[in-house]
Amino acid sequence: MKILNLKQSILALALGFSAFASQAQTAHRCGTDAFSKEFIEKHPELKLNIENLENSLNSMDVNSLPKNRAGNYIIPIVFHVIHNYGPENISEAQIKDAVRILNEDYQKRNADTNLIHPTFKPLIANVGFEFRLATIDPQGNCTNGIDRIASHRTYYGDETSKLNPWSRNRYFNIWVIAGFEEAGLLAYALKPSGAQFSPEGDGVIVWHRAVGSIGTAANAGYSDITLTHEIGHSMNLDHLWGSTNDPKVKCGDDNVTDTPNTEGHEFCDSISLMTDTVCKGTSDNTAGSQGKLEMLQNYMEYSFCPNNAFTNGQKDRMINAINSSTAQRSELFTPTTHTLTGVLDGQVADCNPEADFNAARRFACLGNASGLNVNITYEDFSYKNTINSRDWTFVDGTPAISTTTKPVVYYTTKGWKAATLKASTNATKFGTLTQSDYVYISDPSDKNPSNENTSFEDPNDYARWPIFNYFNNPFTWKYYDAGNVPSGWRALMFNGFDSRPFPQNATNVPFKDIDDIMTPSYNATGLASGFVSFKLASSSTAGNISQINDSLIISYSINCGSTWVELKSLTGSALINNGSQTTPFYPAANTTWSTVSIPMKAAAANANVYFRLRHVGGKYSNNLFIDNFMVGNAPTAVEKVQDGQIGVSLVPNPATNNAAVVINTPSNENVNIVVTDLVGKVIYTTTVSTIANQSSAYQLPSNVFNTKGIYMVTVANKIAKTTQKLIIQ
């Protein structure tokens, strides 16, 4: 199974983009107009070319084309299932059911044609398209026409989710995902005129619950003709109301003579009342041979009536498109294509299985950790053929071998562990996958000391902080050793800057990518009023703070990673403290290092508590650095100080309206606390007395902070002065 095969053209920003939205409680929407406008704004030099292509397609003489030739247009297809081992990883049976529906719809074999309004029955067309799953992939290898890819991009479907496209002149690409970033969408496609300039994004991207009629699509409340509708767009069909406005706006035309003008429909009105429409009697309702009736049952409507027909005029338009060189459509059905993709009559895929597995939990403790859940559950996700037997091997595991679908394993030695699966159809057809450093087993007795900084200067610290790059991409935690950090030379780093060249950086972007790093165990007994604190330096490539949408989530576990409880989520100005830059951010002499101090929860004050730092990628991520991680009574930076110095920390930080200044001085003395806003206006000042080498907290009055924002807190004695940033959320 592939993880992050990076191919994509940035030109796929959606010219000719068409979106089909869900019918349940949500108005149907199409993204054609908005995305076309956005594309033209970014690429105005292409506007005339696109218009010329559209006009050329519309003016083709269909009578000169072999629309009535013997046999169908056989089109090879591939389904790219983008998933994270959830329900979106739909079965081969569900995909084959979707292909069945496509072929019935495009060949007028669907059983519900008898429900079509009598007026329109003479117009219903057999388009003559036949879709077949490829049996040979672009490298000449055996395939069942299903390409499975594990990626975080499954959850936020857009052009950057169209991973590993196969050559569009040989295969029609369909991407299946868990959901779209924009709520309510079922699918979208590119029309040929737009796809001409976006070969890597040409095809359909669709929500898994709108694929076929079984599996996750069974009783889903969505139409099983979603793919039929979207492929219509790919073959140059517009919605019946046109491509320049949403439905229910005004009467429009799709440039097909035998589909009546309509304003479009978002739900199924009574078919018997199709003449009772807004378009009745208006000047808009003049085109179309069928007068004032509206064709609610057309595949290119949103009515879900059910939709069950293309017209002869729509067929002509699609035949024009598939015989055109625009977007290489005319190459999809050639004898060469059929041979190279393995869709000739009688060709059936019988491939070696592709072994794949997953463990939802990848971090646990030693098997002798008393009273703790230490089990790792593996699950077989092999594909490409029927799996009749499995052979698992677990290094240092108990059991060490297994033949079940979901083996449960624990480990009695610590460190990274490998796992191997051999998935077999028979003795000669099998696939094997080994994943090294797949799970990490921690020894809860190997504890980090409380009230001491982990500075990462000792290389031994690195091995005890396991890093999980779940999707094996460039965006990951790593260890940094190039200096300019509070502890001296080394720190933790999250590599968030996307340094990949075009076109690789136009797909599989870091937005919503999840990466974890776990701490060793801490004995936090007696620290119910303590803190988790660390030094933070970070930047963003965003132009303004409202665009910052990455986050750092700090959680704890008292059961060896079986469950995690969130302590704090940092985002926006609470996370980014070194402004914006379009180049990679690294610490320098003038870098701002903020102290993040997070109050412990009472439930975390446990003799065996772990902490997890989870980075969730944003659209404008840059690099992030962490140093001096500590779990203790006092936050980082208020440990024992030298003569003349002042140790200061703000807790919590960020805060709502209640924050305290924790101060440590080397002698009994008076110190001044001054709070200013960002323009330097003093909004609070006081003098407090400290006790030598003892951390003391001084509460700031809540009425000091009347508005959310950033404030500067300065603590000074006769010798030294320290200023820190306080964020009020």
Regions found by a protein language model. Give the residues of each.
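Extracellular glycan-recognition surfaces and repeat-rich motifs
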Residues: 449-507, 511-513, 572-580, 593-594, ...
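C-terminal outer-membrane/trafficking sorting elements
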Residues: 20, 24, 389, 641-651, ...
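Extracellular carbohydrate recognition
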Residues: 510-515, 544-547, 616-634
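Short beta-strands within extracellular/lumenal beta-sheet-rich domains
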Residues: 507-527, 531-533, 594-597
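Extracellular/lumenal mature domains of secreted and surface-exposed proteins
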Residues: 343-452
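Primarily auto-inhibitory N-terminal propeptides
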Residues: 25-106
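Extracellular (secreted or membrane-anchored) zinc-dependent metallopeptidases
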Residues: 71, 77-87, 92-135, 148-356
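Residue-level detector of functionally pivotal "anchor" positions at catalytic/ligand-binding pockets or at interdomain
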Residues: 340-360, 442-455, 510-512, 631-651, ...
